[in-house]
Amino acid sequence: MNKPIEVSASILCADFSKLASEIKRSEDAGVDRFHIDVMDGHFVPNITIGPVIVGAIRPHTKLPLETHLMVEHPWDYIDAFAAAGADIIQIQAEGYGERREACRAYGQYPKEVDSIDEARLRKDLLRIRQHGKKANVV
């Protein structure tokens, strides 16, 4: 099966002082969608973009916005990112599990879990789709 290669450009690589022109430049280069890493400083050590930035990007492109929620309690963010204009919402499976005892100390990354709350995960995937968005688990 020969699927075409798709390019997803990371917004984190952009010059945020020129975000609209960076989006245009990426579109002109032929990207297929924009990838937006959302980090909360808990699930992973970095803090990045929230729904306000996604909402600010949305008017500048018709290309899909793919948000990758690397956050604790991803269910708290689904509605906000859907409303902001995300087309694809990716959630981390580890966000639906209890952190292993050995990883509980602050600063222990990556998050490792023993089990996943599959019912909650399925419920949130359905919620994403009910917003008319594509849902992915990573």
What are the roles of these predicted feature ranges?
Residues 25-31:
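A short, Lys/Arg-enriched amphipathic alpha-helix followed by its capping loop at the start of a domain
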Residues 1-13, 20-21:
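N-terminal amphipathic alpha-helix/helix-capping segment at the start of soluble metabolic enzymes
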Residues 11-13, 38-40, 71-73, 93-97:
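Active-site-proximal loop/turn and secondary-structure-junction residues that shape catalytic pockets
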Residues 42-74, 78:
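A short alpha/beta connector and helix-capping loop motif
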Residues 19, 26, 37, 57, ...:
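Conserved, mostly hydrophobic/aromatic
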Residues 15-18, 60, 64, 76-80, ...:
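Conserved anion-binding
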